[in-house]
């Protein structure tokens, strides 16, 4: 008589691991879909900078093959790099996405805003931004902010509530457990959503390399007339001129972040490809904002002060 033998060995366990970029992409797409499902009129802040370009790319993947189900919004200070504005417009046209532009210069011309003595306009963006959000009845606003950029952004939630004045209260934030996001709000309030909050600058560049994402040319090494101020190379432009004691030099530089010409510094670099930028960023010990943004050096709490008033 034959006796059936029972296999007492457990079946082999099959595990599948996502690499870091896959995990970050999956989280970001989940956040984008969650916001679109929960809110009525979301909008994406799109400047043409690398972070907003990545968020837009993620949104396209999240809803492919359908169109991106929300519009883009940019606050144009009048001090933006021309190359970035051209890229912004071309990208919106290529993806067939509506682009709304809030114009700081218009606010200055009609007296609603006053030009700052130092000539910079970064802090002047808040009023046009909040007006555009209210005028468009946007209840959710996507942004490309990341926690590794600044200590104020490091403590902000992925879904961050703004009150009826557009203000952020860092002492009154909601808990976020795992992938559970609370978007509840009343009429007049809105929520800022940051899908790549957990990404680092290096993650962004590695993702750009993997996905072959196109960026403005300013992110790569090019020769430009610059002058040294406050430890940064500032570009010579119509809104940023050297003082009498500052010398103009022609140097090979690139931009790690593309804010206003009047407050954004370049870094010396020979990186002309994404792979070369990845290697450069991997060796860096300063965040891009800490290294190149004069507007963040006004005070230790410069970013938090602006965010409390409604800034990005």
Residue map of PLM features:
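Nucleotide-activated chemistry modules centered on ATP-dependent adenylation/adenylyltransferase
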Residues: 2-312
């Amino acid at each position: 008589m034959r006796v059936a033998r029972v296999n007492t060995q457990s079946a082999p366990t099959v595990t599948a691991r996502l690499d870091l970029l896959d995990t970050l992409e999956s989280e970001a797409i989940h956040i984008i879909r969650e916001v679109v499902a929960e809110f009525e009129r979301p909008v994406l802040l799109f400047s043409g900078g690398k972070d907003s370009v990545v968020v837009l790319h993620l949104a396209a993947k999240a809803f492919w093959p359908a169109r991106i189900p929300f519009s883009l919004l940019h606050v144009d200070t009048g001090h933006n790099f021309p190359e970035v504005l051209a890229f912004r417009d071309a990208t919106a046209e290529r993806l067939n996405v509506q682009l709304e532009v809030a114009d700081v210069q218009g606010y200055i011309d009609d007296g609603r805003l006053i030009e700052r003595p130092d000539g910079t306009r970064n802090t002047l963006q808040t009023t046009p931004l909040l007006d555009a959000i209210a005028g468009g009845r946007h209840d959710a606003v996507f942004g490309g902010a990341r926690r590794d950029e600044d200590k104020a952004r490091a403590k902000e939630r992925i879904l961050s509530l703004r009150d009826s004045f557009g203000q952020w209260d860092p002492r009154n934030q909601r808990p976020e457990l795992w992938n559970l996001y609370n978007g509840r709000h009343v009429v007049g309030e809105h929520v800022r959503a940051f899908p790549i909050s957990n990404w680092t600058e290096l993650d962004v560049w590695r993702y750009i390399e993997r996905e072959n994402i196109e960026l403005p040319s300013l992110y790569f090494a090019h020769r430009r007339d610059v002058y040294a101020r406050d430890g940064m190379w500032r570009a010579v432009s119509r809104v940023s001129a050297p003082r009498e004691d500052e010398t103009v030099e022609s140097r090979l530089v690139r931009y790690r972040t593309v804010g206003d010409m009047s407050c954004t510094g370049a870094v010396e670099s020979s990186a002309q490809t994404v792979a070369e930028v990845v290697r450069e960023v991997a060796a860096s010990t300063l965040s891009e904002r800490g290294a190149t943004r004069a507007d963040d050096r006004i005070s230790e709490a410069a970013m938090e002060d602006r965010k409390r008033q409604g800034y990005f």
